[in-house]
Structure formats: structure tokens, C-alpha cells
């Protein structure tokens, strides 16, 4: 972001959705907010009370009439003077208002995430809360919304701040033993208690990291891959799950050459289901590429649905992969073997077994995710910094042959790594990347 640290400019942006709409909200933040009111409304409304005013250009022409709210610093989202203008959501109305604001001295259009970045810089939120807001905006399922709301509510911040304070307190005891070993008010050899406390903290962080895998699945989705021989009914199953015709269905074998993916919302959990090229020996170069991609996607899957036509001879062969694999018998309406090999029997012609399979997929997803009620790491940078924290704690605990000064330094570094998660310590290099992921107006 350009000159983002000075905050001398007053920024504005459309914060509501795509135009046209019933109502459009333009947000403003910065030192010229009161000047904007005096110029456009000829009045400054009472703080935090909606006022119905006419919005005018600098030459007095009426742009629109609508509600506006004024939030004086520091009691605002950004910590600066802020305002919201609620206009009718017509394209011409909004474009005119934005053009008028852009002509005012000291005012400019906001960059992506700039409102939230100013809130962070002014101490209105930490990095984890900002990330939670980004995830809340991006949430597409109920599970993703709940997870994002936990983070945006400050649960992570409270946990990491508590851990950091425990490290700081432990380090203070060690340094007190170093500096005041001869003083009567310093307990004799407190270091053993400190190492025990750090060991307990290390186990807490390790358990916390383990829960991050489930959070990542909820945030990024589970991946289910449909495989099988050509004409086993893979595309028909994908179309049923999607609720629409996504894949071409034909009597001709090998019509699916590339990966086809649909996203499902199963009980609030995002699940990506991929149809793949039929697995067989072929001379077709294009089909071979499709089969290679199918095998690569299988290797990344959380669950593989291996389909076989029940109306033909039983010849189930399952490729060796790490993911859980379900054997699904298809075309059950045509009869055939009732072999106990199949986990489910389905028919996309009659609908037999399809709802049971869908219920089973949801149960699988829910079992994988589990109940996420406590604060969990939701991003890879959290996990990386938590692992670095553990590494420094281990050095401090296991450094029996090291001077206490060095072990205290390990504790200082551990607390710094925790501070980087919340943004309390040395995070300037990640700010541009993080806030650029927000939309304009947030």
C-alpha cells in the first residue's frame, strides 16, 4: 500500500454490495471527515445517531437524500473520525457521490483492506481478529461462518496473549534469580518450577496445533474424489450431488477427460467433489493425461469413492492410496451381484441408495471436522509461529548445560513468536499481503 503509515489522507469507498441495489453504503475515515460533512451536508450530525440529510456536490446540486451516521474518533471502527452515507443503490447515484468525494482536498479512494489496516494500526483490533473478519466475509457455509466468528470475536487473541504473558512471567523469574540471587525476597532456585510450567505450556501448544488440522479442513474444505472404470456412473453421481448437469453423460466410454469439481455444503462443511477420467489402459494421449490427473487428485483426497458397475462381472480393484476409500456399486437397477464388497449400492436412474450415500458423506465430513468450540489456529502462519514457539521453549527446558542467560533468551524469542501471531511484535512484512486480501471498503 502506498504511504499507508501516515494516514494523513481521508479515505472513502463503497462498502456495500454490487450495484444496482436497494441501498448503497459509502464509508469514510480520516481527519477530513468533518470537512466532508460540512461540504456535502452543510451540517455535522449528532454522533452515532442516524440523520436524514440531502447530499450535495460542491456547487450545491443535490446528489441524493438518505441516512448518514457519524462516528467520531476514537470510538469508531478505524479509531479515526468515520462516517457512513446510505444512498439509493443506483449506479449513477453512487458514481456521482464517489466522484464528488474524490474532488475534495485530502480525500482519496481507499485501497483494499485499508479501513481494517487503520483499525489495526490504531489498536482497535489485532491481526487474528482482522484475519477472522476476512474469513467471515469469505465464509460460504455455516461451519465456516462459526469458525470465523470465533476468531473475529477475539478468542485466539485471548489465548495467545495469555500464553505470551506466561512466558514473560517465567522469564522474569529466571532473570530475578540471575540478578538477585542473594536477596531474601527471591525464592531459592525457582528455575525448576519454571521449567515445569514451560513443559505444561508446551503440551498445551502442541494440542492446540493438532486442532488446527480440523480448522484447516473447515476453512478450506474436504476433498472427495470419484474414481472408477469408464461408464461406471461417475458423471451421473456427480450430477446428482451437484443438483444440476455438470458432466456429460453418454453411452460412449471415456467422455470425461479432465477433472470436474463441484462444491457442496454438507451440514455447514464445504466439501469439494471431483469427477475424474475413467481408469483404464488407453492409447489416447489426452485420455492418458486425464488419468494421470485423476491419480494425482486421488493422492490428495480425504475420501475416495471407487465406483463399479454392479450389472457386470465383479472385478473390484482399488489403487493403493492413503485416503479412506468406499466401494460403491452402481446401476443397482440393472440387478447383478449383491456382493458384500460394496459399502453402498446406488442407482442414479431410480435414485436408490443416493440419499443414504449423501447422508454418509455428511456424517464423514462431520466426523473429520468434529466440534470446534475452542480457539484454534486457522492459518498456516499461526501454525508456523506456534511451532517456532515450541522449538524455543524446548531449548529453554532442555538446556541444562547452558547458562541461565541463554535459556532466558530462548524464552524471550518464544514470546516474540507468539506476539507475531497477534501483531504485537515485528509483523510489518506480512501486513501488505494480509490486508490486500480484503475487498475495497473493508
Curated annotation (Swiss-Prot):
Q: What is its main location?
A: cytoplasm
**Which cofactors is this protein said to need?**
K(+)
Give compartment(s).
Cytoplasm
Tell me which Gene Ontology terms the entry assigns under biological process.
Answer: tRNA methylation; tRNA wobble uridine modification
Q: Which keywords does the record carry?
A: Cytoplasm, GTP-binding, Hydrolase, Magnesium, Metal-binding, Nucleotide-binding, Potassium, tRNA processing
The record's annotation in PANTHER family points to: TRNA MODIFICATION GTPASE GTPBP3, TRNA MODIFICATION GTPASE GTPBP3, MITOCHONDRIAL
Protein name (Swiss-Prot/TrEMBL): tRNA modification GTPase MnmE
Organism name: Brucella abortus (strain 2308)
Which gene is this protein's source?
Answer: mnmE
Amino acid at each position: 500500500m502506498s504511504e499507508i503509515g501516515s494516514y494523513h489522507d481521508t479515505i472513502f469507498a463503497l462498502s456495500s454490495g454490487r450495484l444496482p441495489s436497494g441501498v448503497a453504503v459509502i464509508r469514510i475515515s480520516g481527519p477530513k471527515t468533518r470537512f466532508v460533512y460540512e461540504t456535502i451536508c452543510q451540517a455535522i450530525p449528532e454522533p452515532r445517531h442516524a440523520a436524514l440529510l440531502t447530499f450535495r456536490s460542491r456547487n450545491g446540486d443535490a446528489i441524493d437524500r438518505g441516512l448518514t451516521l457519524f462516528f467520531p474518533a476514537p470510538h469508531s471502527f478505524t479509531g479515526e473520525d468515520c462516517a457512513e452515507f446510505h444512498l439509493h443503490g443506483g449506479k449513477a447515484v453512487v458514481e456521482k457521490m464517489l466522484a464528488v468525494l474524490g474532488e475534495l482536498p485530502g480525500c482519496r479512494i481507499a485501497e483494499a483492506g485499508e479501513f481494517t489496516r487503520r483499525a489495526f494500526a490504531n489498536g482497535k483490533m489485532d491481526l487474528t481478529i482482522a484475519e477472522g473478519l476476512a474469513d467471515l466475509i469469505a465464509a460460504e457455509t455455516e461451519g465456516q461462518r462459526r469458525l470465523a466468528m470465533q476468531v473475529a470475536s477475539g478468542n485466539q487473541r485471548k489465548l495467545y496473549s495469555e500464553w505470551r504473558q506466561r512466558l514473560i512471567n517465567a522469564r522474569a523469574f529466571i532473570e530475578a534469580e540471575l540478578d538477585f540471587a542473594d536477596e531474601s525476597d527471591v525464592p531459592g532456585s525457582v528455575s525448576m518450577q519454571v521449567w515445569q510450567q514451560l513443559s505444561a505450556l508446551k503440551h498445551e501448544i502442541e494440542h492446540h496445533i493438532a486442532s488446527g488440522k480440523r480448522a484447516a479442513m473447515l476453512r478450506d474444505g474436504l476433498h472427495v474424489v470419484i474414481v472408477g472404470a469408464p461408464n461406471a456412473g461417475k458423471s451421473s453421481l456427480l450430477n446428482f450431488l451437484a443438483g444440476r448437469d455438470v458432466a456429460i453423460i453418454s453411452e460412449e466410454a471415456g467422455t470425461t477427460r479432465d477433472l470436474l469439481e463441484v462444491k457442496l455444503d454438507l451440514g455447514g462443511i464445504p466439501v469439494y467433489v471431483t469427477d475424474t477420467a475413467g481408469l483404464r489402459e488407453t492409447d489416447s494421449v489426452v485420455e492418458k493425461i486425464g488419468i494421470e490427473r485423476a491419480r494425482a487428485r486421488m493422492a490428495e483426497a480425504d475420501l475416495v469413492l471407487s465406483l463399479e458397475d454392479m450389472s457386470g462381472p465383479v472385478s473390484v480393484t482399488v489403487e493403493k492410496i492413503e485416503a479412506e476409500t468406499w466401494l460403491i456399486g452402481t446401476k443397482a437397477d440393472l440387478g447383478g451381484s449383491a456382493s458384500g464388497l460394496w459399502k453402498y449400492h446406488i442407482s442414479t436412474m431410480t435414485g436408490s441408495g443416493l440419499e443414504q450415500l449423501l447422508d454418509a458423506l455428511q456424517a464423514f465430513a462431520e466426523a473429520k471436522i468434529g466440534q470446534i468450540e475452542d480457539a484454534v489456529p486457522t492459518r498456516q502462519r499461526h501454525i508456523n509461529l506456534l511451532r517456532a514457539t515450541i522449538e524455543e521453549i524446548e531449548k529453554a527446558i532442555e538446556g541444562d548445560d547452558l547458562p541461565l542467560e541463554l535459556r532466558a533468551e530462548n524464552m524471550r524469542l518464544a514470546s516474540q513468536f507468539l506476539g507475531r501471531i497477534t501483531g504485537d511484535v515485528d509483523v510489518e512484512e506480512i501486513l501488505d499481503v494480509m490486508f490486500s486480501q480484503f475487498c475495497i471498503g473493508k
